[in-house]
């Protein structure tokens, strides 16, 4: 019995250490995926290809078929969240597509056993949260900037109360909102507001990016702390390998945006960013 108690003590200590180290890694930014920058015109979308059906490495397999079906189920709530935040629904969907493809291709067994049979989106609950993969610290900043008129990310008085909490435990309520497996509205709303805040800050600085899908998606991926308004920003972000083809987060988002996929639910509205 004494031996068993010792073993259990060691196991619990190891588990505790794992979560402490994990929190420290997130806080210090050590879990941020190394990014890349797209070279030349490798993934550039030509105007003649906008909205055209075309086979690409990311839309040929069962992963895309599953994702396509899962997103169709959420089309109404995605459009609702985008409207509330005032962003292009297809831009929001583009970021969702990339995050889910990244998850599907990196978590192969979970995809085969859960996501594919049930045709559902993957909901994260550890270092990143929800179907959009938002980091907890980013979610807190999104909330903070909504109420800070001095911030370049401030959207105005009418947006201030969109994320108000209804309980006294903000951390618990935030987590519950973002990791809800059955209702993804909060995940979409946080992400839509985040996109709006990024666009607003860049426009205020004199470098509007509303028409640049790839750059906006890149900023969504790399975070507030790396968002530095400037001329000629580059498309990049985390590198995602799909069927032996390397994409950056921003390039894949742009490629989806201008593709012929999911046009019925999310029509292309931005043609000036090419």
For the regions a language model picked out, list residue spans one by one.
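Cell-wall glycan-active module
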Residues: 1-274
